Regions:
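Active-site-adjacent structural elements in enzyme catalytic cores
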Residues: 1-170
Length: 170
């Protein structure tokens, strides 16, 4: 139902797995994803082996959704960016733990209600934590990289203002 798409699955490695410990952070777990982007799928078919690839962002920063975001983040530290257009989702992949009873480890492009309906699990499972150090799980992961003020009545001239409220019913 969700593959290919913006979802990653945490699985237990087989004892004699050929997956590098560098990829798994010395864990016996691995996250697997089936991307939907046509360029990524073409690359995976051409190389004919699994590919380990992080998000194109510096740790603890917001994930890029366009080529320009990547260039802005890395500047001259990178030589090229594969142009595939802007992200259709704009968020990281949802990460599902499939070791034991399925549960959501990180919310992302697929909402929890849809996933929990699919795996027929209770929302209480979402609170269960798996002791895994994985990309995107840091409390700083979605930090914008600039100071933020909450519950501001009036913004300063050099600040943006985001209003969050319930939508009015039509």
């Amino acid at each position: 139902k969700f593959c290919p798409g913006p979802i990653s699955f945490v699985l237990k490695l087989k004892k004699k797995s050929r997956v590098s410990k560098i990829i798994t952070n010395n864990s016996n777990l691995v996250a697997v994803r089936f991307p939907s982007h046509h360029l990524t799928r073409k690359i995976l078919k051409e190389i004919d082996y699994p590919l380990a690839a992080p998000s194109a962002n510096i740790s603890s920063s917001i994930s890029p959704v366009s080529k320009q975001d990547v260039i802005d983040e890395f500047g001259n530290k990178i030589k090229f960016v594969l142009e595939g257009g802007s992200s259709k989702v704009g968020l990281e992949s949802t990460i599902i733990n499939l070791v034991g009873k399925p549960n959501i480890l990180r919310l992302g492009g697929i909402d929890s209600k849809t996933i929990y309906e699919f795996i027929k699990s209770s929302k209480n499972n979402q609170k269960r934590e798996l002791n895994v150090k994985m990309p995107g799980s840091s409390k700083l992961h979605y930090s914008p990289g600039i100071p933020m003020r909450l519950n501001v009545k009036k913004n300063n001239d050099d600040e943006a203002f985001i209003l969050i409220r319930k939508r009015k019913k039509k």
